[in-house]
Curated annotation (Swiss-Prot):
Belongs to the peptidase C1 family. InterPro entries: Granulin, Granulin_sf, Papain-like_cys_pep_sf, Pept_cys_AS, Pept_his_AS, Peptidase_C1A, Peptidase_C1A_C, Peptidase_C1A_papain-like. Disulfide bonds join C39-C81, C73-C114, C172-C223, C256-C268, C262-C283. This is Low-temperature-induced cysteine proteinase. One of its GO terms (cellular component) is lysosome. The keyword Hydrolase applies. Induction: In response to low temperature. Residues 1-17, 238-346 form a propeptide. The lineage of its organism: Eukaryota, Viridiplantae, Streptophyta, Embryophyta, Tracheophyta. The active site is at C42, H178, N198. GO terms for molecular function: cysteine-type endopeptidase activity. Its EC number is 3.4.22.-. It is an enzyme of class 3 (hydrolase). One of its GO terms (biological process) is proteolysis involved in protein catabolic process.
């Protein structure tokens, strides 16, 4: 994970006095548990839940926010239904100046074209975000005592998948693959636990939540939950409610050739090429992207160097810092996104 927002705000200190337990559900700052369905958008649900809660804590208004806006519009580094990171979601909302409501931009359980009009409906904003000191459950406890916190954990293991209720103490590794939110902590019969808010629906586990053992021997926490904790920061009011305005002009899709096109804001990349002719086009979910030579992946314009073997993108040759390469999706026939288009291929 690339992060510029490391913070010692919640680093444990001598004399810290924390509540023995806290359950943010009882504080009225969490909306009902949502269901991401078959879309790999857990990162969006985690980030949104954290933003919903800090907005409620600061303003007193509990507003359900839009995961679909993140899935459709946050495409600089996140990949919609193919995964993402909560920190990048926070960055998107900060740069965008806010995020729309769930009611106005509802969840569709699939990737879609960014609705520019609703993207500009900035109902709730955050000021920044910070990362909790990693591999430190005491620091995480201190953070959760102040607000719900986004985390990632390994959820693909057999024990985790078959867990039904009670405090989870099963076997799992630290290959974190699922974004959730820690919504509190407590102790039962001498065992410390975290209250974890999932995004698999309210009928899953304990009404959509689960309890995971806390203060284990591993510094990374059970299932790696202390590896990537972060939280949004909000200090000011939300933007004023904008006056109704007509939808922004919709940009035409990108034409790859006379038969194929990609959605607006994406780049045409050839998948099947013979000599200088392309027989099948794909779409990289970024504007101005670099098409990698493997005819499968692509890189953001600010990380233009393709490292095909590693599946990463670098800012320059030999630079060890990079981001994960993105996958292309198949282009659509001309007319699939409506009339119009422009040539823009790489």
């Amino acid at each position: 994970k690339l992060s510029k927002n490391k913070s010692d705000r919640y680093l444990p200190k001598v004399g810290d006095s924390l509540p023995e337990s806290i359950d943010w559900r009882e504080k009225g700052v969490l909306v009902g548990v949502k269901d991401q369905g078959s879309c790999g958008s857990c990162w969006a649900f985690s980030a949104v839940a954290a933003m919903e809660s800090i907005n409620a804590i600061v303003t007193g208004n509990l507003i359900s926010l839009s995961e679909q806006e993140l899935v459709d519009c946050d495409r600089s580094y996140n990949e919609g239904c193919d995964g993402g990171l909560m920190d990048y979601a926070f960055e998107f909302v900060i740069k965008n100046g806010g995020i729309d409501t769930e009611e106005d931009y509802p969840y569709k359980e699939r990737n879609g074209v960014c609705d520019q009009y609703r993207k500009n409906a900035k109902v709730v904003k955050i000021d920044s975000y910070e990362d909790v000191p990693v591999n430190n459950e005491k620091a995480l406890q201190k953070a959760v005592a102040h607000q719900p916190v986004s985390i990632a954990l390994e959820a693909g293991g057999r024990d985790f998948q078959h867990y039904k209720s009670g405090i989870f103490t099963g076997k799992c590794g630290t290959a974190v693959d699922h974004g959730v939110v820690i919504a509190g902590y407590g102790t039962e019969n001498g065992m410390d636990y975290w209250i974890v808010r999932n995004s698999w629906g309210a009928n899953c586990r304990e009404n959509g939540y689960l309890r995971v053992q806390r203060n284990v021997s591993s510094s990374s926490g059970l299932c790696g939950l202390a590896i990537e904790p972060s939280y949004p920061v909000k200090t000011g009011p939300n933007p004023p409610k904008p006056a109704p305005s007509p939808p922004s002009p919709v940009k035409p899709p990108t034409e790859c050739d006379e038969y194929s096109q990609c959605a607006v804001g994406t780049t045409c990349c050839c998948i099947l090429q013979f000599r200088r002719s392309c027989f099948s086009w794909g779409c990289c979910p970024l504007e101005g992207a670099t098409c990698c030579e493997d005819h499968y992946s692509c890189c953001p314009h600010d990380y233009p160097i393709c490292n095909v073997r590693q599946g990463t993108c670098s800012m320059s040759k030999g630079n060890p810092l990079g981001v994960k390469a993105m996958k292309r999706i198949l282009a659509q026939p001309i007319g699939a996104f409506g009339n119009g288009g422009k040539k823009s291929s790489s």
